[in-house]
C-alpha cells in the first residue's frame, strides 16, 4: 500500500493498493457514507443515443461517490464500491448510481471520519509492502541462489557455492557441506520474513532442511520444501509459474489466523483466558482485560463492533480482523463473530 497524498483538514487520504492484501484492507476500512474519488468508466448517452435507444459508449472520467456498499472479489482481484454520484462531469447526473472498481495499482481518494484502527491497518499494509513477501532458496549439492521476492519485484540476494567435489575425501566433503549450509542459514537469519521456500532437484534441499531443524530451530517453522526440475534463475521461474509462492503466502496468513482461533477454542474449553460474544467482550473491556481482540471481517462495519475495536486499541490491546472465508474464520463467526484473548482471568 502506498499513501499518495494526505489532506488532514479535509479528512482525505489518497491511496494506491499494490496487492490482494491491500485490497482486503480497503474492503475493511471503506464503509457506508464515506466519499470515494477515483478515475472510473461509465456509459454516457448523448441525445443521439437516446433517440436510437443506444446505451451509450463507455468513457473514462473522474467521479466522486458516496458509498452505499462495498464488495470484495478475491478471484478478479477487485474491490467494488457502490454508491451515488456526488461529483463528476456536467453530463453525468448527480445522485445517479455508480460502481467504482479498484484493482492493484489503481489510485483512490477516501474522505471519511477516520478511526484509529483504520489508520493502523493502512500503516500495517505500508510496512508489509516494505518487507519481502518470501525468501526463495533454489539449491542443489553445488550451489544455492537466494532471492527476495516481493509482490512486484524480485531481487537476487546472493549465490553461495558448496566447494564440494567428488575428488575430495568423504569427511572433507561433509565438513564443506556443513559450512555451505551454515552460510545459507546465516543469510536467511538476516531477513525478517515469515516464509522461506527451499526448492531444488535431488536431495540437497531435504538434507538442508534437516540441518536447519537441528542447528537453526528458529528458522525451521518458516521453511517449506518443494521439488523443482532445475536450479538457478530458471528454478525460480519454475517456482513462480507453478504458483508455489502465492500458495505459501496465502496459507501463511490463514495459518496465523487459524492458530489464534485454535488458542481461543483451547482457552474456552478450559474456561481460561478467553471470552466470546459481544456481551462477554464488553465485560472484559470494562476490566481492561483484552490482550487480543478477534473480529470477523463480516462485522467490521457494525457500529457497535467499531466502538469495541476503538476501545480495545485505546487500552493497548491488539486487534486482528479474521477472514470468514476459511474454516477457522467460520468458527469465529459461529461464536458471534467477536472474541477476546485475555491478559488475566475475569469473573
From Swiss-Prot:
Keywords: Cytoplasm, Endonuclease, Hydrolase, Metal-binding, Nuclease. GO terms for cellular component: cytosol; translation release factor complex. It is found in: Cytoplasm. HAMAP family: PelO. The gene is pelA. The N-terminal domain has the RNA-binding Sm fold. It harbors the endoribonuclease activity. The keyword Protein biosynthesis does not apply. It comes from Methanocaldococcus jannaschii (strain ATCC 43067 / DSM 2661 / JAL-1 / JCM 10045 / NBRC 100440) (Methanococcus jannaschii). Coiled coil: none annotated. Its cofactor is a divalent metal cation. Belongs to the eukaryotic release factor 1 family. Pelota subfamily. This is Protein pelota homolog. Its EC number is 3.1.-.-. One of its GO terms (molecular function) is metal ion binding.
Amino acid at each position: 500500500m502506498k499513501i499518495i497524498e494526505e489532506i488532514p483538514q479535509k479528512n482525505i487520504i489518497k491511496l494506491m493498493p499494490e496487492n490482494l492484501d491491500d485490497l482486503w484492507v480497503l474492503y475493511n476500512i471503506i464503509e457506508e457514507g464515506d466519499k470515494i474519488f477515483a478515475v472510473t468508466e461509465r456509459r454516457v448517452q448523448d441525445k443521439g443515443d437516446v433517440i436510437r435507444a443506444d446505451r451509450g459508449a463507455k468513457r473514462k472520467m473522474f467521479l466522486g461517490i458516496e458509498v452505499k456498499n462495498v464488495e470484495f472479489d478475491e478471484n478478479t482481484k477487485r474491490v467494488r464500491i457502490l454508491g451515488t454520484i456526488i461529483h463528476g462531469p456536467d453530463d453525468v447526473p448527480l445522485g445517479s448510481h455508480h460502481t467504482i472498481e479498484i484493482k492493484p495499482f489503481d489510485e483512490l481518494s477516501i474522505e471519511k471520519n477516520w478511526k484509529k484502527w483504520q489508520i493502523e491497518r493502512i500503516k500495517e499494509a505500508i510496512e508489509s509492502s516494505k518487507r519481502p513477501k518470501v525468501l526463495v532458496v533454489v539449491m542443489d549439492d553445488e550451489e544455492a541462489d537466494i532471492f527476495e521476492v516481493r509482490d512486484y519485484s524480485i531481487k537476487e540476494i546472493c549465490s553461495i557455492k558448496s566447494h564440494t567435489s567428488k575428488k575430495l575425501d568423504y569427511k572433507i566433503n561433509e565438513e564443506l557441506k556443513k559450512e555451505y549450509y551454515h552460510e545459507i542459514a546465516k543469510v536467511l537469519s538476516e531477513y525478517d520474513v515469515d516464509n522461506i521456500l527451499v526448492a531444488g532437484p535431488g536431495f540437497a534441499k531435504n538434507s538442508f532442511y534437516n540441518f536447519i531443524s537441528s542447528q537453526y530451530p528458529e528458522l525451521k517453522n518458516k521453511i517449506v520444501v518443494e521439488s523443482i526440475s532445475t536450479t538457478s534463475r530458471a528454478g525460480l521461474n519454475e517456482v513462480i509459474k507453478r504458483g508455489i509462492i502465492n500458495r505459501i503466502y496465502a496459507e501463511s496468513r490463514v495459518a496465523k489466523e487459524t492458530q489464534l482461533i485454535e488458542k481461543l477454542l483451547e482457552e474456552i474449553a478450559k474456561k481460561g483466558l478467553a471470552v466470546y460474544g459481544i456481551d462477554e467482550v464488553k465485560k472484559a473491556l470494562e476490566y481492561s482485560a483484552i490482550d487480543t481482540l478477534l473480529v470477523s471481517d463480516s462485522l467490521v462495519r457494525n457500529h457497535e463492533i467499531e466502538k469495541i475495536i476503538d476501545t480495545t486499541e485505546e487500552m493497548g490491546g491488539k486487534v486482528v480482523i479474521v477472514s470468514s472465508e476459511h474454516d477457522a474464520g467460520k468458527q469465529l463467526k459461529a461464536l458471534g463473530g467477536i472474541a477476546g484473548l485475555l491478559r488475566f482471568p475475569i469473573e
